[in-house]
């Protein structure tokens, strides 16, 4: 929909012009604009497309982005999404089964990458708001705690950029305790009653403990403690392509990996 005339002209039935730019219908979820490109969800809620101008076609095109990760929306649809501009330009999406999907999108650098996030519960809603150092991602998570299903409003912690493991927060629905005196009993975990939580105390990993009466007890006292639900981070590489002795591809051939070199970025 476009309006003819200058910015100061009034909107009238004669000044409004409707022009179809793509044949792909959109869902009821409002689109997001990233770097001048509009990202919208197709009518069935399973295909994400970008609407951008093509000089070759001399018009707008809407290529499919989910073709890079069709399995993420093959059987489930997107019910809600929100765009987090900083620090990494990510579109966060909630799937109808409670899974959280992220789309890292930086078209100027040709970066389009999907990633999924699983928690001990189900994501139901997501939104972003401005924060002091970056945009904050807030979610509504449905968890079953002590036999009762509850909905929690949770904030995704800022990306860890420190050089000390004492402030590394890598748990779900967790709390941080930072006090002057060491202690071994920490309260305030009523929202995780009966759950087994992971603990990082003064930069060291402690054995998992169970929340009882809203508190946990550590074997040794500590000052800075992070406690919450644990999660596992998995990375799956592409198939190794080592070439062939006779030329061509090595796909389908037997391989034996004898050495692996792992390069880490800003590891502790």
Where are these predicted regions, by residue range?
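Beta-sheet repeat architectures centered on beta-propellers
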Residues: 2, 8-27, 33-37, 42-268
């Amino acid at each position: 929909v476009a309006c003819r005339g200058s910015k100061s002209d009034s909107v009238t039935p004669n000044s409004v012009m409707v022009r179809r730019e793509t044949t792909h219908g959109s869902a009821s979820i409002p689109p997001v604009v990233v770097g001048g490109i509009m990202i919208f969800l197709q009518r069935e809620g399973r295909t994400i497309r970008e609407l951008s101008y093509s000089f070759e076609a001399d018009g707008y095109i809407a290529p499919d982005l989910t073709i890079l990760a069709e399995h993420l929306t093959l059987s489930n649809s997107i019910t809600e999404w929100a765009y987090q501009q900083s620090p990494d330009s990510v579109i966060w999406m909630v799937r109808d089964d409670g899974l959280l999907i992220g789309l890292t999108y930086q078209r100027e650098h040709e970066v389009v990458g999907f990633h999924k996030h699983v928690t001990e519960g189900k994501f139901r809603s997501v939104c972003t708001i401005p924060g002091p150092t970056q945009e904050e991602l807030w979610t509504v998570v449905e968890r079953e705690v002590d036999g009762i299903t509850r909905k929690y409003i949770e904030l995704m912690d800022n990306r860890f950029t420190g050089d000390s493991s004492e402030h590394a927060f890598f748990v779900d629905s967790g709390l941080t305790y930072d006090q002057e005196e060491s202690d071994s009993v920490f309260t305030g975990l009523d929202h995780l009653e009966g759950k087994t939580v992971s603990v990082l105390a003064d930069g060291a990993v402690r054995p998992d403990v169970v929340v009882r009466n809203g508190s946990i007890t550590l074997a040794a006292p500590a000052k800075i403690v992070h406690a919450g639900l644990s999660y596992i981070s998995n990375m799956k590489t592409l198939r190794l392509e080592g070439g062939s002795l006779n030329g061509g591809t090595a796909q389908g051939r037997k391989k034996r990996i004898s050495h692996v070199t792992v390069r880490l970025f800003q590891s502790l």
